From Swiss-Prot:
One of its GO terms (cellular component) is extracellular region. The gene is gcg2. The lineage of its organism: Eukaryota, Metazoa, Chordata, Craniata, Vertebrata. The keyword Phosphoprotein does not apply. This is Glucagon-2. Promotes hydrolysis of glycogen and lipids, and raises the blood sugar level. Disulfide bonds: none annotated. Belongs to the glucagon family. GO terms for biological process: response to starvation. Residues 83-87, 123-134, 171-178 form a propeptide. Its main location: secreted. It comes from the Eukaryota. It comes from Oncorhynchus mykiss (Rainbow trout). Induction: Produced in the A cells of the islets of Langerhans in response to a drop in blood sugar concentration. Pfam families: Hormone_2. Keywords: Cleavage on pair of basic residues, Hormone, Secreted, Signal.
Amino acid sequence: MFGIHSLAGVLLLVIVQSQLASPLQEAEDNSSLETADSLLEDLRGVPNMKRQSEGTFSNYYSKYQEERMARDFLHWLMNSKRSGAPSKRHADGTYTSDVSTYLQDQAAKDFVSWLKSGPARRESAEESMNGPMSRRHVDGSFTSDVNKVLDSLAAKEYLLWVMTSKTSGKSNKRQEDH
């Protein structure tokens, strides 16, 4: 308890002394306030200069990085040329790939055109070499012959059905009419 009372007394003493000293310092503070304001304005201008200098530094640093990257690239190019090892460029690989794709497409087109027009040429070439040969199913002769036979059978059955149904239908109608 005694410690708290002594602490409160010391604080009261400090406050009273500061209150008595403040009227004396007011006269001195007016002149110091003017200098403090001018110092604050000067300090406010400093961060702008720092920002500008930071921007200048960043600009110079990025230019330095670009120059360094260009220099490193040139050194790499010169070293790769000096090594004498055959190097495959990306453009060469792309060209080779494009040519391969084109040739594959062209081969596919040639094969399809050969399939479309090939049997007649192949048949005449085979006949001249080996004599007459029977046509294969791939050539389409068997399929077309079977289709012709089936069409003629279907036509005969249809005609037979029509003839039988008309005669029975006519006779029924005639019987109903009479």
